[in-house]
Design a protein with these regions (language model features):
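Positively charged n-region of N-terminal signal peptides that target proteins for export
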Residues: 1-6
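Intrinsically disordered, low-complexity segments enriched in polar/charged small residues
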Residues: 7-8, 314
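C-terminal motif of bacterial Sec signal peptides marking the signal peptidase cleavage site
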Residues: 14-17
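Predominantly soluble domains enriched in secretory-pathway, periplasmic, or organellar proteins
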Residues: 19-391
């Protein structure tokens, strides 16, 4: 009996001594078979949203350095690089950017922004922001859109906010009230433009863009655009491209463009009757895909295309003639290589299991596909030389 007691004591002490060790979840390396091409782009991070409530947001990495003969894809690298982080990245990854050689990840339902080194993906900071959505940067400041209130469908929701963060100290330094359920935001000149959706307030959607003067950090005004705004991107002509998701069962989705008038005030010029779920602007080309529910067919209608941002013309209704693009179940993210114009499409599949990343050459020919985490949605290229701002 005494020997059994001593043996049990020894086992308990051993377990106690080990429990503080970090349990490392190793990333999975997959050879895509694609040929590497050396350029100033050395890699691409991909943020998998993970289904809401599952805490399965993960970060993948595509090695484009050219140090190997073929391109390698690494799944779930954040957990491996940061084994002591509780719950890893969290619940619903909603945006991903690189600024000042740091990787910024907006984790929506975990109410936080995670910051890591862009080269090694080591965690630097966690910034608490309620129901955060998207992020934009101007010099030493980050601007994060936030629904503020809880995740719930109700016409009685509070106005959203934009939080201002010092990128050197990771501290919130200010915030400002905008419209209902603000989504993407972008900067042109000294103005911050915020697309307000009102997505929780069905059927009383918001239909405005908030214009914020960055010097004073004050909202100058709101301009009417359309119901349920989402994407907001700027091109090199200082035009804004803003998507409206419509009302789903009435007003159709459209893409609006805005440009400065003679007084420099941003005004709505016109729209194109296309659904845009995501887009990527490279030069004069706006690549997009749209996923729109059809109440006639009772299924999603998927479309692709390219718009010339200078002429405002839809120049093609496809990105590729390859049969592989037809195999995509649910396109959820798109990114175009700004150097070679090859592009990547993220397929969310059924939302609850692994998605896929598909790579196409600039001419649309299919190259390779790999499995990702759940709901691949946001990607950013890592450059060989990232700009460093004043410290």
């Amino acid at each position: 009996m005494r020997q059994a007691t001593l043996y049990l004591f020894f086992i308990l002490m051993l377990l106690s001594a080990c429990r503080h060790d970090d349990y490392i979840i190793y990333s999975i390396d997959e050879d895509t078979g694609g040929k590497t091409v050396k350029s100033e782009i050395v890699g691409m991070y991909l943020l998998n949203e993970g289904n809401m409530g599952s805490n399965k947001c993960t970060l993948d990495y595509l090695d484009l350095s050219g140090n190997t003969e073929t391109v390698h894809y690494y799944r779930n690298i954040y957990a491996e690089r940061n084994p002591s982080t509780v719950k890893e990245l969290g619940d619903v990854g909603n945006d991903l950017k690189i600024h000042d050689n740091k990787l910024w990840m907006v984790i929506n339902c975990s109410n936080k922004v995670e910051v890591a080194t862009a080269d090694s993906c080591r965690r630097l900071a966690k910034i608490d922001i309620p129901n955060c959505r998207y992020i934009a940067f101007d010099d030493n400041y980050a601007y994060v859109s936030s629904y503020v209130g809880p995740v719930q469908i109700s016409t009685n929701t509070q106005l959203g906010r934009v939080y201002k963060i010092d990128t050197r100290t990771y501290q919130k330094v200010d915030s400002i009230e905008v419209g209902y359920q603000p989504e993407e935001l972008c900067i042109v000149g000294n103005k911050l433009y915020v697309a307000n959706s009102g997505g929780y307030r069905i059927p009383q959607y918001d239909h405005t863009i908030s214009i914020i003067d960055l010097s004073a950090f004050k909202e100058e005004k709101k301009i009417d655009v359309a119901d349920n705004l989402h994407r907001c991107r700027a091109d090199h002509y200082n035009q804004l491209w803003v998507s409206s998701r419509g009302t789903y069962n009435g007003t159709p989705a459209k893409l609006f463009w805005l440009e400065p008038d003679k007084q420099g005030e941003m005004t709505v010029k016109d729209n194109l009757p296309v659904a845009v779920s995501d887009m990527c602007i490279v030069g004069d080309s706006l690549y997009f895909f749209g996923v729109e529910w059809s109440y006639v067919k009772m299924e999603n209608e998927i479309s692709y295309g390219i718009i010339n941002v200078r002429t405002h013309q839809l120049i093609t209704r496809q990105l590729s003639e390859a049969k592989e693009i037809e195999s995509i179940t649910l396109p959820y993210g798109l990114i175009v290589n700004p150097v070679h114009r090859d592009f990547y499409i993220m397929d969310a599949k059924n939302y609850v299991s692994s998605g896929e990343l598909l790579h196409f050459h600039a001419d649309g020919t299919f190259d390779w596909r790999v499995w990702t985490g759940d709901i691949p949605a946001h990607a950013v290229f890592r450059m060989k030389k990232q700009p460093i701002y004043n410290q």
